[in-house]
Curated annotation (Swiss-Prot):
Gene3D superfamilies: Nucleoside diphosphate kinase-like domain. GO terms for cellular component: cytoplasm. Its EC number is 2.7.4.6. Transmembrane segments: none annotated. Belongs to the NDK family. GO terms for molecular function: ATP binding; metal ion binding; nucleoside diphosphate kinase activity. This is Nucleoside diphosphate kinase. The gene is ndk. It comes from Rhodopseudomonas palustris (strain BisA53). The active site is at residue 117.
Length: 140
């Protein structure tokens, strides 16, 4: 296994309930290091760019509105097989189908308000990280 970096967002439904510490604890317990983190309020342009892959989907507008509705915490995570490890600790998109002990099972409100985003591949992670962090902000 190789050490990888992946990208994570703690979404507005998580930050409004002050879950950053609880979610970070689950991430770290899964063996991932948080090597960069900042709390921001996404602009509409940032959210539209970030979720451009979904632009033609019927939920795109609602997704963008949700992501700009409150603060988010953007993160760079590092560890062995980080992308898969993070996806495992996040759990299924639908919290009712997520495994016990996962972030979404414990904290998500719904499929739409599912508390966390994680990159789906190392290549995607590199693109997503570059959207929110400069090299000198990643201090792992």
């Amino acid at each position: 296994m190789a050490v990888q970096r992946t990208f994570s967002i703690l979404k507005p439904d998580a930050t409004e309930r002050n879950l950053t510490g609880a979610i970070n604890a689950l991430i770290e317990k899964a063996g991932l290091r948080i090597v960069a983190q900042k709390r921001i309020r996404m602009t509409r342009e940032q959210a539209e760019t970030f979720y451009a892959v979904h632009k033609e989907r019927p939920f795109f507008g609602e997704l963008v509105d949700f992501m700009i509705s409150g603060p988010v915490v953007v993160q760079v995570l590092e560890g062995e097989d980080a992308v898969l490890k993070h996806r495992d600790v996040m759990g299924a998109t639908d919290p009712s189908k997520a495994a016990d002990g996962t972030i979404r099972k414990l904290h998500a409100k719904s499929i739409g308000e599912n508390s966390v985003h994680g990159s789906d591949a190392p290549e995607t992670a590199a693109i997503e990280i570059a959207q929110f962090f400069s090299g000198n902000e990643i201090v792992g």
